[in-house]
Amino acid sequence: MNPTKRNSHAIVEFVDVLLRDGAVIQADAIVTVAGVPLLGISLRAAIAGMTTMTEYGIFDGWDADHRRRNAQP
């Protein structure tokens, strides 16, 4: 039995879902040397299309300012 769905479009479908629905990545790390904590890292990243970002209230001000600046002649 051969598969009926081809995997050639998998990356396109992944990007489509990522832009439509978005994703949030959060990571925390502590760098220690000899048991002594030296550096703390906290990372939060969101990736999505601008439509999704503005629906969730992310980049509202930036999007409005950017559109206003680009609309001026």
Curated annotation (Swiss-Prot):
Expression induction or repression: In PHH4 (a deletion of the p-vac locus) transcribed in all growth phases, maximal expression in mid-stationary phase. An unstable 6kb transcript able to cover gvpD-gvpE-gvpF-gvpG-gvpH-gvpI-gvpJ-gvpK-gvpL-gvpM is detected, as well as smaller transcripts. Gas vesicles appear earlier when grown in static culture, possibly due to O(2)-limitation.
InterPro entries: Gas-vesicle_GvpA-like, GvpA, GvpA-like_CS
SUBUNIT field: GvpF to GvpM interact with each other in vitro, and may form multi-subunit complex(es). Might interact with GvpA.
Keyword Amino-acid biosynthesis recorded: no
Family per similarity comment: Belongs to the gas vesicle GvpA family.
GO molecular function: structural molecule activity
Superkingdom of origin organism: Archaea
UniProt miscellaneous comment: Encoded in a 14-gene locus called c-vac which produces cylindrical gas vesicles only in the stationary growth phase.
Protein's name according to its UniProt entry: Gas vesicle protein M2
Subcellular location: Gas vesicle
